[in-house]
Curated annotation (Swiss-Prot):
Protein name in the entry: U1 small nuclear ribonucleoprotein C
Zinc finger annotations (Matrin-type) as residue ranges: 4-36
Classification via HAMAP family: U1_C
Source organism (scientific name): Aedes aegypti (Yellowfever mosquito)
One Gene Ontology CC term in the entry: U2-type prespliceosome
Gene3D superfamilies: Classic Zinc Finger
Amino acid sequence: MPKYYCDYCDTYLTHDSPSVRKTHCTGRKHKDNVKFYYQKWMEEQAQHLIDATTAAFKAGKIAQNPFSAGPPKPNVAIPPPSMGMPARPGMIPGMPAGAPPLLMGPGPMGMRPPMMMPMGMPPMGMGMRPPMMNGPPPQMNQKVYHNTDRRYHR
């Protein structure tokens, strides 16, 4: 009768029966060996990624650091409005340039101006959903019981 070999533990089990394999796989040593095996595998993958990135950097395929220069500088500096400058339409005189206009009347031919996002929210891109404010709907929080789970059936 063939014996069962455990690759993680590097040992043969006494019998090739489901009960022996189940007992072995639930043991502390086996679980520790499996955990160690996958930790070692992840470390090897990380080292491989580091080596590949280093080789690509040395070959000149990766830029130095695109984020070290900071944001691009604007070409034209707009002076802030002073008390003596006239206000733009919809602005209160002396209001800072970055503030949103307060009074927005109807646009050309009686059309409304476009809707503005609330302060502090970034503009949404195509296909993006608005953020959820109150969490998931109530039916998403309920636990689902399956017919095979006999603990919850009488």
